[in-house]
């Protein structure tokens, strides 16, 4: 019989606010809210500290409303370089216990500690070690769920906050999980929760006890998936951190980002696509490749993922051409049933930059060489003086979305159960 898995889900508590308080001890135990631009009252709260939350301040709340709830609140501008650095520190701690670490944004990650138990103790004991280490070394807290699969582990980390460990096993999961709202389950967004409500399915227990055929009829294949999750049937593996075959040839180069707020307009999407295309193009040049195709992946606020790709008329390593192709795919295939939460851009069908290619009549080798020299020069400036030393004008249209070094902040996202479902 296979050994029962020990899966952990670690969730940093009020992550942005916690990083600010760790970096600025004078803010500790005070009501603070991290926001994009404190000078703009049209801005929103990205994260609030627990003292602010107790006063009614919530994520996504306009700043003027947050101040009505909490008169002495301190608004702090977001510092994504700081949060990325802290995120890297947490992952270094996780990797002391297992190489199977699957990040979920900057502040969450799954760990498979099954094989680590002989060295470090039970899953619960490892969770305690990680929690204590994060607190001692970084000055922030995390909540950890321990279970036999990823779904239950995530429900465990959400169950008690802050600074808590919750074990959900096969013996107690119905008692703990079944009374929880169905919306707490992974992949149940607002629209899906509303549909379930219409069928008197209000809790995870209700979902688990509903006939799977009925759920499939009403929700499609996601209905069966949710039924399995509600019943603890999740065998999805935890990916190895930055898993790659070192000796294998590079077949594609990509970057993805979970944005600090939902993307609601074409301009939002263009800014993020261009940001990612810059990173992908720079890595193509660094590795001496051109790409003959571009792939875009979109994840909406319900966590559904779909991917589309297209061939290019000519191989390229230019960010403008990659961004334009990605935006074309997005415009053609995405119809805004939900806001977007994450975007990925990938250069595919690679060829060495020394390989000759067939050109068209309107192709200008001189113009291509000029653009490639320009972008290589920008790479050199950024390598010496930092990413933000040179930026495109489009990046100043929304600093909240564009203030990210996509190469440094690259995040691995979990495997999409619902690839191609949109």
Predicted regions and their residues:
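Short acidic, glycine-rich loop/turn motifs
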Residues: 36, 298-302, 349
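A generic structural signal for short beta-strands and their flanking turns/coil linkers
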Residues: 28-30, 71, 140, 290-294, ...
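Gly/Gly-Pro- and Ser/Thr-rich, intrinsically disordered tail segments characteristic of DNA damage-repair
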Residues: 1-228, 238, 282, 365-422
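C-terminal hydrophobic structural anchor segments
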Residues: 321, 327-384
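Short Gly/Ser/Thr- and Asp/Glu-enriched loop/turn motifs at secondary-structure junctions
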Residues: 104-108, 147-150, 289-293, 338-342
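DNA-contacting surface of Y-family translesion DNA polymerases
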Residues: 9, 192-340
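Short, hydrophobic beta-strand segments
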Residues: 109-115, 307-310, 352, 357-363
């Amino acid at each position: 019989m296979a050994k029962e898995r020990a899966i952990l889900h670690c969730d940093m508590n009020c992550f942005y606010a916690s990083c600010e308080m760790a970096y600025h001890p004078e803010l500790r135990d005070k009501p603070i809210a991290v926001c994009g631009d404190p000078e703009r009252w049209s801005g929103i709260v990205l994260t609030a500290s627990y003292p602010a939350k107790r006063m009614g301040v919530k994520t996504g709340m306009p700043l003027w409303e947050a101040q009505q709830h909490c008169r002495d609140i301190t608004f702090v501008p977001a510092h994504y370089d700081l949060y990325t650095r802290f995120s890297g520190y947490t992952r270094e701690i996780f990797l002391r216990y297992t190489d199977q670490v699957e990040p979920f944004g900057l502040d969450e990650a799954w760990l498979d500690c099954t094989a680590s138990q002989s060295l470090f103790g039970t899953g619960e004991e490892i969770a305690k070690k990680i929690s204590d280490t994060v607190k001692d070394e970084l000055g922030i807290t995390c909540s950890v769920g321990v279970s036999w699969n990823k779904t239950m582990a995530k429900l465990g980390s959400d169950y008690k906050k802050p600074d808590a460990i919750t074990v959900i096993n096969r013996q107690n999961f119905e008692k703990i999980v079944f009374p929880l709202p169905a919306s707490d389950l992974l992949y149940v967004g607002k629209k899906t929760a509303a549909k379930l409500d219409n069928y008197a399915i209000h809790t995870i227990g209700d979902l688990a006890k509903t006939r799977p055929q009925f759920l499939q009829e009403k929700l499609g294949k996601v209905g069966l998936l949710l039924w399995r999750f509600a019943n603890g049937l999740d065998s999805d593996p935890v990916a190895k951190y930055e898993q790659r075959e070192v000796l294998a040839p590079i077949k594609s180069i990509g970057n993805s980002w979970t944005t600090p707020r939902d993307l609601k307009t074409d301009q939002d999407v263009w800014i993020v696509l261009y940001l990612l295309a810059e990173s992908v193009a720079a890595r193509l040049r660094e590795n001496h490749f051109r790409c003959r195709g571009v792939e875009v992946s979109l994840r909406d606020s319900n966590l559904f993922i779909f991917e589309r790709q297209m061939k290019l008329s000519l191989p390229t390593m230019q960010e403008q051409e990659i961004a334009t192709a990605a935006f074309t795919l997005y415009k053609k295939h995405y119809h805004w049933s939900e806001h977007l939460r994450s975007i990925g851009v990938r250069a595919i069908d690679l060829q060495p930059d020394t390989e000759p290619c067939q050109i068209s009549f309107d192709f200008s080798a001189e113009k291509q060489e000029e653009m490639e020299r320009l972008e290589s020069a920008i790479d050199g400036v950024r390598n010496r003086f930092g990413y933000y030393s040179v930026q495109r004008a489009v990046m100043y249209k929304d600093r909240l979305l564009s203030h990210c070094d996509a190469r440094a902040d690259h995040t691995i996202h979990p495997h999409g159960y619902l690839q191609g479902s949109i």
